[in-house]
């Protein structure tokens, strides 16, 4: 959070962030939207975990890429859950909205669990209702 932003970031909020340059990364640095995925309990830490968004929809769709069509985004964007990263809160520039749709939030959780090889369990930010969601069957 910069000096003009006093608000603590919450899970599933969409922020504009200044992403740092990362050597050997396919992710573009600079100002771009991200989805905060850190839990509320970590509010006092100097960093948050984020998933970067891209407007490039022409790349091959992966199970860890979630399409978000959200009124807070000027174009449909893909959440790159395979590029989850820690980010210093000072790099968060401005809150632009949040992931409103429960299905999109579920899809983000599922993609993160898939990428991190975690079971989709209540301890991973899922509610009991999510456990019985039709997408979780099988």
Where do the language-model regions lie?
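Short alpha-helix capping/helix-loop boundary micro-motifs
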Residues: 1-4
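Compact nucleic-acid interaction/catalytic patches
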Residues: 25-70
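C-terminal terminal-subdomain/extension
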Residues: 7, 70-138
């Amino acid at each position: 959070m910069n000096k003009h932003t006093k608000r603590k970031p919450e899970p599933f909020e969409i922020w504009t962030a200044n992403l740092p340059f990362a050597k050997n990364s396919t992710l573009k640095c600079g100002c771009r939207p991200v989805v905060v995925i850190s839990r509320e309990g970590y509010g006092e830490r100097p960093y948050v975990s984020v998933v970067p968004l891209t407007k490039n929809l022409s790349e091959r769709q992966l199970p860890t890429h979630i399409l978000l069509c959200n009124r807070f985004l000027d174009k449909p964007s893909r959440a790159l859950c395979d590029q989850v990263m820690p980010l210093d809160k000072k790099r968060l520039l401005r809150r632009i909205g949040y992931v409103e749709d429960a299905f999109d939030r579920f899809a983000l959780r599922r993609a993160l669990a898939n990428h991190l090889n975690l079971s989709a369990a209540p301890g991973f930010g899922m509610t009991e209702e999510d456990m019985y969601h039709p997408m979780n069957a099988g």
